Amino acid sequence: MKKLLLATVASAAMATAVSADDVKIGVFLGFTGPIESLVAQMGPGAEAAIAEVSASGSFMNGSTVTAIRADTTCVDAGAATAAAERLITSDKVSGIVGGDCSGVTTATLTNVAMPNGMVMISPSATSPALSTIEDNGLFFRTAPSDARQGVVMSDIIMERGYNSVALTYTNNDYGKGLADAFAAAFEAAGGEVTINASHEDGKADYSAEVGALAAAGGEILVVAGYLDQGGKGIIQASLDTGAFDTFVLPDGMVGDSLPEAIGTDLDGSFGQAPGTDSEGAATLVSIAGDSFDATSPFAAESY
């Protein structure tokens, strides 16, 4: 798979760069929206790799490589597809790093990338549905599917001695896919999901959603959402009302901005995100220096 991915990227670049001195790669992530604090590290991660390739002088007989940013917004499929169209038709990119969130990635792949024969490599679109989507050999990702994360999250919760959880998820492809994978794994292991309810991002008040979650009960609350919008709102409303005081945080909820916003009330909560403690990860931290946080979720996958 790794060799196929690299060959595909190289072929895409060659298609437009045989006689050119500069190859453009789109960095197509949610620079605004519900995971913008994560993308603040992911974008520079992707750009560091592009700059490294360009500086090597070894790509395409010395051709340079330039990163072109475009905003997926994470949640607005219309805005994302328009941005991807601009990358392809106006900026003339040869490949795309992205998208980030699963819904906009699916929409862009189907409506823009496939009709234009454009390669997309996502660092963070984790919906299980993307594993089997018809992609004409154009879509790859460097993060594992939520089919796996759901099992891992179930195992972690069980190991900590919890057997009953309430579950809320952001109402999109990412949230629904992760919630379904987790609920299936947790119930198969003998756990109880008291409620499996969606929430919308961008609301000012989540008291109704939290009221329903509290009424269903559960020892802890699993929040399969986004740390900069709905997920944060659910947690704050839960704390304000006393509905829950311990939260399980999957990858879309892991980042510095959440504890900065909530503070010590998050003490005791836990979660997980894909990553590695490999030698390569340590090397990336050195490469990043002070320019970005290479340990942030999906920064390494973006690189």
Please report, for each region that a protein language model flagged, where it lies by residue.
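Extracytoplasmic ligand/sensor domains, especially the bilobed periplasmic-binding protein
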Residues: 89-197, 246-271
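Extracytoplasmic "Venus flytrap"
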Residues: 26-47, 70-77, 100, 168-176, ...
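Immediate post-signal peptide segment of exported/extracytoplasmic ligand-binding proteins
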Residues: 18-27, 58-66, 157-163
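Extracellular/periplasmic periplasmic-binding protein-like sensory domains
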Residues: 235-303
